[in-house]
Design a protein with these regions (language model features):
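Alpha/beta-hydrolase superfamily serine-hydrolase fold, recognizing
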Residues: 1-120
Length: 120
């Protein structure tokens, strides 16, 4: 949510956001990363539940491709000018790969970032 709201605030000329902290962010509606397949069978954040939740939130492909829904799908140009970000992922979490991918994409777009990983 932080990623989408920060992008939206930039696109709509406010409010000005100085810094973003993304704690284990869900940044893509595909639910199809290696970490989802490796850790998405547990009792806390199951891949099947996340697929169900995404179906409720954004039922069709057009909605899921919207950068306000899946910030990882934003272009580098759309991400340029965002405030600095702290992206925190968890080592054994289904959302790890998409959080790390989003942090890399922010860096490619020239957004100052710091990354942290919560180890097991």
């Amino acid at each position: 949510m932080t990623a989408a709201l920060t992008l939206m605030a930039k696109d709509r000329d406010g409010p000005k956001i100085s810094y973003q902290v993304l704690m284990i962010p869900a940044t893509d509606a595909s639910v199809d990363t290696a970490s989802y397949h490796e850790y998405g069978t547990g009792r806390f954040l199951a891949r099947a539940f996340m697929k169900y939740a995404w179906d409720l939130y954004a039922a069709d492909a057009a909605a899921r491709n919207n950068p306000y829904v899946s910030p990882l799908r934003a272009s580098l140009q759309q991400l340029q000018g965002l405030p600095p970000a702290l992206v925190i992922t968890a080592e054994n979490d289904p959302l790890r790969d998409e959080g790390e991918a989003y942090a890399r994409k922010l860096q490619e777009a020239g957004v100052s970032d710091a990354r942290g990983e919560i180890a097991r």
